[in-house]
Amino acid sequence: GDVYKRQTVLFLLAADDVSRWHCVHGGDEIWTFLGGAPLSLFQHSDRADRSSEQLVSADQPVTWVPAGVWMAARSQGDFSLVSCCVGPGFSFDDFEMLRDRARSEWPKGIDERLI
């Protein structure tokens, strides 16, 4: 099908919700904080031995996740509202949930609490 140059979604993450480890293989993703509590954004490259955590908040409102990097997120409060912009446009053909891989294929050092 058609591939858009960029696509943006609004994403509301409630207090007890977790955006589980996933990867957009075909495009970079920009996360922009819009409101609520700060959001913990976790990233894990296949080249890394451990996951990194970055706070996305009013003080640090924009962050970038390169194509091919695993990401997960959770709110630090009652809720977090962010926008996620993917370029080139999002396609489920380029999207993968880590839980769909065999455990032996998980990246070394991945934070398993976010599977």
Residue locations for each model-derived region?
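Short, surface-exposed beta-edge/turn micro-motifs
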Residues: 6-8, 18, 27-30, 79
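Short, small-residue-biased leader/transition segments that mark boundaries at the very start
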Residues: 1-4
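Glycine- and acidic-residue-biased ligand/ion/polar-headgroup-sensing regions
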Residues: 14-17, 24-46
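Cytosolic-biased juxtamembrane loops and peripheral soluble domains of multi-pass membrane proteins
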Residues: 46-58, 97-104
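Conserved metal-binding segment of the jelly-roll/cupin
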Residues: 57-76
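Short histidine-centered beta-strand/loop micro-motifs
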Residues: 19-24, 54, 73-75
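Double-stranded beta-helix
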Residues: 74-115
